[in-house]
Amino acid sequence: LGNGIDPLKVIDEYGADALRMMLMVGSTAGNDMRYSDEKVTASRNFANKLWNASRFVQMNLPEDFEPGMPAEELLDMSDKWVLSELARTAAEVTANLDKYELGLAAEKVENFIWDIYCDWYIEICKSRLNGEDAQQADTARKVLVWVLDKALKLLHPFMPFITEEIYQALPGSAETIMTQEWPDAGKMTAWPQECADFEVLMDYIKAVRTIRNDMNVHPAKKTSMTIETANPAAFQKGGAYLARFAFATDVALTEKYTGTTDGVVTVVTPAARGFIPMMELIDREKELKRLHKELEKAEKEANMFRNQLNNPKFVERAPEKLVNETRTKLAASEDKIANINQSIQALG
């Protein structure tokens, strides 16, 4: 019929691991799944992400590096967070596999590696690895390797080739990953309070970075901030993270903010409100001009997609995939318009 997929051609283009992972993620027992190049590309991108992360870790290991878990008193907030998340992921993935929920298990391993290990923990470790505290640098290296080792074992059933290749390159690795003990969450330590505090910090940092991006503030420009919160402990412990990732020069904590709101942008999360004098970092008139130009462009795009979808001939005759893509693009354009309008309102 000409509508089949030759798996060997897919493997040649994307790799066997990418195809295997695509077939697992999002699949449920008893249901058919639709093949798409986009999904295989996403799985290949994940493999590339993992490979690059492992290369970064290996490049930062000295020749005399000895793997192992550091003593608890040497672990900082981010170490305890990533180790707690690893324990949670191992427990959930094991439970999913016991119930033959392969799609859920694969998705959870991918989310842990991509979002938690690569996007957050590795980024956090960069300043520690390059810092003057040799003990902290060694602790970061040990946790990076220990977590990577366990994550590779969790991922191995789904992506056996890349996990074996990376595992073999790790210090202290055995002959093959296939014969290694499965990560047992019951043998891992978790720190619920440290983990919860770090999640509070992450929510706040994400919100600050989002609004800085929306207002086109360069990362080199830093400012003070006042944080109104009923949970000051998380922010007290996380001062270094606020300086590094929220671009704070200094942080004041308060139960109730009573300062001025003129030229101040408010950042709201479930656990805190941040008050940041953002206007001192930007050229207000120049930024408003840029935003209005972006708004005009986004409105033109939205109108184009809207006109297509309002045309009965397009909806009836165009391929279903194209119609759905147009709906998705319209929704994205409308979200963009809303975000731009919020930024314009914030600038007054």
Q: Which residue ranges define each predicted feature?
A:
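Short, solvent-exposed helix-loop connector elements
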Residues: 31-39
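Alpha-helical recognition segments enriched in aromatics with Gly/Pro capping
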Residues: 1-31
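Feature 926 captures the class I aminoacyl-tRNA synthetase adenylation module centered on the KMSKS loop
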Residues: 1-6, 12, 38-348
